[in-house]
């Protein structure tokens, strides 16, 4: 397992199991092979809730609000046989694009109760990615053992994946990779699948500045900018420069598709950013590419001439 070390796009898929207090609705048929219950689940069962340790007093008595969504979670009492915690199909992938599959996990056994030897049977979750027909395992990775603790805490785990030419759909899966018994009880939250790309900065050529201020009396001016990807993910780089007057609404600059870019004459406050993809076709989809932080060009007004 490992995180995207570059820039992360908006989630293509996110499962946060809902908000609100108490127990939520069961998962759709086929999502898990565990059995839904209201209240604390026993071996082979699960619930959707923001509350745990209602009947089982060896669990932590609350889920910490430290995930992305801070709502309900999938709470599972893992079985003696390896079971499927969760699966979902993902469509709309771009070809030759990098992605990150992540989730927050928590061992809910409270080791300070002493109910199990040591820290109890650890939880261990296997992440898998399958092709759209569920016939070929494309990638897998395991968290390793996550021991019970006297303190309740979430920890995020992730796996990266690169789609192939013509591949636009996959299936995400999460499996029990440990043994049933005293322990191996867990909560899962915020399962996210998102694009992953290089972290790219913009600077003037031969400079490291991330913004420029220009006095109004020196206008108009042209600035030579350069995109600086960190090469953490992409092996090839394709660019589309954009500009904005407010830093929120962006427009493509026709023909600006190289790492270096010379602005047209600037006469007012302007923002620039660059969209980066590993395949040129992915520049047409914001979910399959990444964006740099904005580069700001500030125009400083000329102060009024003092009156005599």
Question: What are the functions of these language-model segments?
Answer:
Residues 2-94, 105-108, 114-126, 133, ...:
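Aromatic (Trp/Tyr/Phe) and Gly/Pro-enriched flexible surface segments
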Residues 99, 168-170, 268-272:
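Exposed beta-strand face motif in extracellular beta-rich ectodomains
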Residues 179-182, 277-288:
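Short, solvent-exposed loop/turn segments at the edges of extracellular beta-sandwich modules
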Residues 194-201, 293-306:
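Extracellular interdomain linker/stem segments of modular secreted and single-pass surface proteins
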Residues 219-229:
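A short beta-strand segment in extracellular, disulfide-stabilized domains
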Residues 229-243:
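Solvent-exposed loop segments of extracellular immunoglobulin-like
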Residues 242-244, 273-277:
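Conserved Ser/Thr-centered positions that define the repeating blades of beta-propeller domains
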Residues 242-265:
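Surface-exposed, flexible coil segments in extracellular/virion-facing regions
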């Amino acid at each position: 397992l490992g995180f995207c070390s570059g820039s992360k796009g908006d989630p293509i898929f996110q499962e946060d199991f809902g908000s609100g207090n108490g127990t939520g609705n069961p998962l759709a048929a086929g999502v898990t092979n565990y059995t839904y219950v209201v209240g604390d689940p026993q071996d082979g069962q699960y619930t959707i809730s923001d509350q745990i340790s209602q009947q089982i007093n060896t669990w932590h008595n609350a889920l910490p609000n430290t995930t992305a969504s801070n709502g309900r979670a999938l709470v599972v009492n893992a079985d003696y046989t390896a079971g499927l915690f969760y699966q979902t199909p993902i469509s709309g992938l771009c070809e030759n694009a990098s992605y990150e599959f992540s989730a927050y996990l928590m061992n809910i056994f409270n080791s300070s109760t002493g109910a199990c030897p040591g820290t109890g049977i650890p939880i261990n979750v296997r992440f898998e990615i399958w092709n759209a027909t569920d016939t070929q395992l494309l990638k897998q990775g395991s968290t390793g053992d996550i021991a019970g603790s006297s303190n309740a805490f979430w920890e995020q785990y992730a796996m990266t994946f690169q789609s192939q030419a013509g591949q636009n759909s996959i299936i995400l899966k999460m499996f029990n990779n440990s043994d049933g018994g005293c322990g191996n009880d867990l909560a899962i939250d915020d399962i996210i699948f998102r694009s992953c790309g290089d972290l790219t900065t913009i600077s003037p050529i031969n400079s490291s500045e991330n913004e420029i201020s220009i006095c109004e009396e020196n206008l108009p001016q042209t600035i030579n900018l350069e995109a600086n990807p960190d090469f953490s993910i992409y092996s090839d780089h394709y660019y589309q420069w954009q500009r904005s007057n407010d830093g929120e609404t962006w427009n493509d600059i026709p023909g600006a598709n190289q790492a270096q870019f010379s602005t047209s004459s600037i006469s007012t406050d302007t923002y620039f950013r660059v969209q980066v993809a590993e395949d040129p076709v992915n520049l047409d989809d914001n979910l399959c590419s990444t964006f740099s932080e904005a580069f700001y060009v500030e125009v400083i007004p000329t102060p009024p001439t003092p009156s005599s």
